[in-house]
Amino acid sequence: MLAYCVQDATVVDVEKRRNPSKHYVYIINVTWSDSTSQTIYRRYSKFFDLQMQLLDKFPIEGGQKDPKQRIIPFLPGKILFRRSHIRDVAVKRLKPIDEYCRALVRLPPHISQCDEVFRFFEARPEDVNPPKEDYGSSKRKSVWLSSWAESPKKDVTGADATAEPMILEQYVVVSNYKKQENSELSLQAGEVVDVIEKNESGWWFVSTSEEQGWVPATYLEAQNGTRDDSDINTSKTGEVSKRRKAHLRRLDRRWTLGGMVNRQHSREEKYVTVQPYTSQSKDEIGFEKGVTVEVIRKNLEGWWYIRYLGKEGWAPASYLKKAKDDLPTRKKNLAGPVEIIGNIMEISNLLNKKASGDKETPPAEGEGHEAPIAKKEISLPILCNASNGSAVGVPDRTVSRLAQGSPAVARIAPQRAQISSPNLRTRPPPRRESSLGFQLPKPPEPPSVEVEYYTIAEFQSCISDGISFRGGQKAEVIDKNSGGWWYVQIGEKEGWAPASYIDKRKKPNLSRRTSTLTRPKVPPPAPPSKPKEAEEGPTGASESQDSPRKLKYEEPEYDIPAFGFDSEPELSEEPVEDRASGERRPAQPHRPSPASSLQRARFKVGESSEDVALEEETIYENEGFRPYAEDTLSARGSSGDSDSPGSSSLSLTRKNSPKSGSPKSSSLLKLKAEKNAQAEMGKNHSSASFSSSITINTTCCSSSSSSSSSLSKTSGDLKPRSASDAGIRGTPKVRAKKDADANAGLTSCPRAKPSVRPKPFLNRAESQSQEKMDISTLRRQLRPTGQLRGGLKGSKSEDSELPPQTASEAPSEGSRRSSSDLITLPATTPPCPTKKEWEGPATSYMTCSAYQKVQDSEISFPAGVEVQVLEKQESGWWYVRFGELEGWAPSHYLVLDENEQPDPSGKELDTVPAKGRQNEGKSDSLEKIERRVQALNTVNQSKKATPPIPSKPPGGFGKTSGTPAVKMRNGVRQVAVRPQSVFVSPPPKDNNLSCALRRNESLTATDGLRGVRRNSSFSTARSAAAEAKGRLAERAASQGSDSPLLPAQRNSIPVSPVRPKPIEKSQFIHNNLKDVYVSIADYEGDEETAGFQEGVSMEVLERNPNGWWYCQILDGVKPFKGWVPSNYLEKKN
């Protein structure tokens, strides 16, 4: 490094220079290490060169390898589309360049003292003796170099190259002009400009006091009022004007950057049109592209007089290109150099050039009628005929003489008025860009990329006019709907498919790996009304036993197999009584339970999507995906007691799920469930409703097999496991009607619009074939979201939304119970108990407060009256009889009649007498448990340990009931619910606690603790889980193989124990964005899921459509990763 170095550099001002061309330099005060100061002058280009040298020499410090390591300051960028040598640009750059200099000299010595920096700031001869500029007056006619500042106008021989002045002609602006492009200048009338270049296109490059740019020649006039250098003309026949003679004594040449005007006569020149032109007035000539025309007269205003097809008239010069065969002749005629400016950067070079010969006189600043003459060699000036009214017509002999090459050519200005030429003063010629266009090859048209559409993931459609497909299949898009559904053709099939499952690629690139990275998280809303007929409700076929595989709502295969309204034949075999007995085992789809698939599924990290997060937060009401352990518990129960309702539902779920069968896991789960139940009972009163909501989600994802059975979507031969099934099968009309309504709701849902199955209507009398179940109707029929997996009877959504069927709903409870045992299964709004179910022992309760029904499925009653509880739902909705009326009522409005034993309470009300004893005991304990749960829920609500979920009235999806907003998840409408603790029935010892459950909270009233499935509500206490375990055993023993036969919960909507199921890569919903979420409630994990406290931040790495997200928990000493229920998360602000 140099000891003598720059200590400081300050840019103080800018200064204009005109040598070699107009530009600005920055005045820099440089202080050196020896305390000496110098003033140097540098133009921007020198700064730019220095910067490039530094970046090349110090790539690391320049940030080329790592931008974060850059220490070399940034230099103001180049001006690409504007003149960088105008004052306003120079002034704007002043401060940034000053900062650049200051920063530069403060860099580490190996940079600030390098040779490049030293040479840049070192004083040069021009810095010591800066050129003196004489700017003259604004009226000057030319700008001289410093050596000729006061040189008078005189004849110059041109012998001395260094002594010759360069003249820039001055013109006066005759009219205001507003620039249209950056390269142009705006003009004010009366302003004087220096003409640097005159282009045949009619656009001249001029310089004002501060800037330079292109302007239309028609707006300029020579200072003496003439149109100088526009045309060649003579004043009289065979006679040269006096002005012309005067100029013969001078150089017949005038400097312009465009070149010199060569006043030679030549034949008419042939030009080829480069683009079509349509005449806009009678004195113009139109032509097509590529035709040859003869140019009779040229001028620098951009309009040439041409002959085409025997007609003569004016045409824009920019549309003409010299014919190739005419170029040689033209070259021979050139007496001087013709300079064509191909680049603005050549201007300075031209200014430095010397005139090679002074054989021609400069164009005369002709009479008022003259027009400027072309800079390039001007062709033979064909004069207008007298017939045209030209005052300056030249007789034929003059024309012939000129044609022979007469040395003296008078200039004639085309009297536009006389020859009816365009009024160029008000009409600028075509843009200069157009005129230059023919000189440059036209950019090629962008290559058209042919694209094709293909599917990016597997999708199973359950709507009549939908289409199922695998990932990677080629699809032809026939119609696109703004709702997010496209009508596509895949192979020989056509139908509606979610646009989020379709991507496009270049046709040639067939090998492109299908990816879901950019695929929207969830299928969009249903297609347009186009498939309306399909919307009329998935019927029969879709709802057939095959339907279980196909959810009514369209879900991607990976989202969780939907067991939609399937009722397992085995389950169907189970008598309604069994179902009533609470043994209602969720029909177990033949398909592996979603839980198992979920467990297998492992979504890719980074598959997060905020939208899904938001939806999922509300979708899963409880920790539903809660502990797989609980699920396992239930699963175990199911595996061990597959016959038992709980076990059957679980077994379905678990059976399909890899771990479901593991007794050990189930027991562990039970214990965990128990433990969690207690903890969460205190903690999350809302869990219940949450569980129900989870249930909904599960249903959407493909409810657990039990739920599917409960939906009894399967063929009618299967006996309804749930009341809904029963109803469908023809169980007591009341119950059947309810189920039918629920099913009808399911059926009615337009197929075109996949949505969460509506809550089953509670109309018991109406039984509807499962085929007619429609998602939308089901959804409408869904009971309060808070219900427990309540017997899985309803699909998740159903469960969550339907009032939980309490013990009274034995049949659906059977499945529900299995679900209760499996707590995982959400309870759908209990369909009205079938008569068999509710004919069982009814418990008398007293109303503690008046209640006004909100939906038709509910019942109103005054305070202090006795009502008979026919069916109980864990969600807190009980089916009661008051006088001749029956309907759903919130359990917290009822208190046990002192004289009444809760024997049949809980599920047992519905249970068959055969199971009555066990059920009775269970119901008794359940009753107590329910009361305890209610109390806990109330406490939790007050504590707001988990976000409370507004309950929904049993009969439908009415807003009044507080049903959570319906959201689309994987093409299925789902009830958005916040996590709420769903309590598994605590051990009987806790029964003394009685508290009204919130409407959407699920009671753990079911017989025993049900194993919690992943989408089921689990806020069940672990103790409850243990109890459930015991109950499962009892149930298994008492019910024996009957439990498997128990139909799924009434009106059950498929509920899937939604554990993250393995998903093909192609099915992953990827999103590269990493989002940070915050937990909104405590969650106690299991061996498969991660537990966390409320308020914990976590980064979403993967999002599984079933509602389980793979996250990295950020809070804590050591971050860890695991699956967490998405409904326990909310976006971090």
Curated annotation (Swiss-Prot):
Domain comment in the entry: The PX domain is required for podosome localization because of its ability to bind phosphatidylinositol 3-phosphate (PtdIns(3)P) and phosphatidylinositol 3,4-bisphosphate (PtdIns(3,4)P2) and, to a lesser extent, phosphatidylinositol 4-phosphate (PtdIns(4)P), phosphatidylinositol 5-phosphate (PtdIns(5)P), and phosphatidylinositol 3,5-bisphosphate (PtdIns(3,5)P2). Binds to the third intramolecular SH3 domain. Required for interaction with RAB40B. The fifth SH3 domain mediates binding with ADAM12, ADAM15 and ADAM19.
The record ties this protein, via SMART domains, to: PX, SH3
State where composition is biased (Acidic residues): 567-576, 608-620
Where does this protein reside within or beyond the cell?
A: Cytoplasm; Cell projection, Podosome
Report what the protein is called. Answer: SH3 and PX domain-containing protein 2A
Gene name linked to the record: SH3PXD2A
The organs and tissues expressing this protein are described as: Found in several cancer cell lines, particularly invasive breast carcinomas and melanomas.
UniProt lists compositionally biased (Low complexity) regions at: 634-652, 658-670, 686-715
Is Repeat among the key words of this record? yes
**Upper taxonomic lineage:** Eukaryota, Metazoa, Chordata, Craniata, Vertebrata
- Role description: Adapter protein involved in invadopodia and podosome formation, extracellular matrix degradation and invasiveness of some cancer cells. Binds matrix metalloproteinases (ADAMs), NADPH oxidases (NOXs) and phosphoinositides. Acts as an organizer protein that allows NOX1- or NOX3-dependent reactive oxygen species (ROS) generation and ROS localization. In association with ADAM12, mediates the neurotoxic effect of amyloid-beta peptide.
Coiled coil regions in record: 917-946
User: How is this protein annotated for GO cellular component?
Assistant: anchoring junction; cell projection; cytoplasm; cytosol; podosome
* PTM comment, free text: Tyrosine phosphorylated by SRC. Phosphorylation plays a regulatory role in the protein localization. The intramolecular interaction of the PX domain with the third SH3 domain maintains the protein in the cytoplasm and phosphorylation disrupts this interaction, resulting in the redistribution of the protein from cytoplasm to the perimembrane region. Phosphorylated on serine upon DNA damage, probably by ATM or ATR.
Assigned protein family: Belongs to the SH3PXD2 family.
State the Pfam families in the record: PX, SH3_1, SH3_2
Superkingdom of origin: Eukaryota
Domain (SH3): give its ranges: 166-225, 266-325, 448-507, 840-899, 1072-1133
- UniProt KW keywords: Cell junction, Cell projection, Coiled coil, Cytoplasm, Phosphoprotein, Repeat, SH3 domain
Name positions with the PTM Phosphoserine: 406, 421, 547, 567, 593, 644, 767, 769, 819, 1002, 1016-1017, 1038
Domain PX, residue spans: 4-128
UniProt-annotated stretches for the region Disordered: 415-446, 505-840, 899-924, 941-964, 1029-1059
> Keyword Translocase on this protein?
no
- What biological-process GO terms show up in the record? in utero embryonic development; osteoclast fusion; superoxide anion generation; superoxide metabolic process
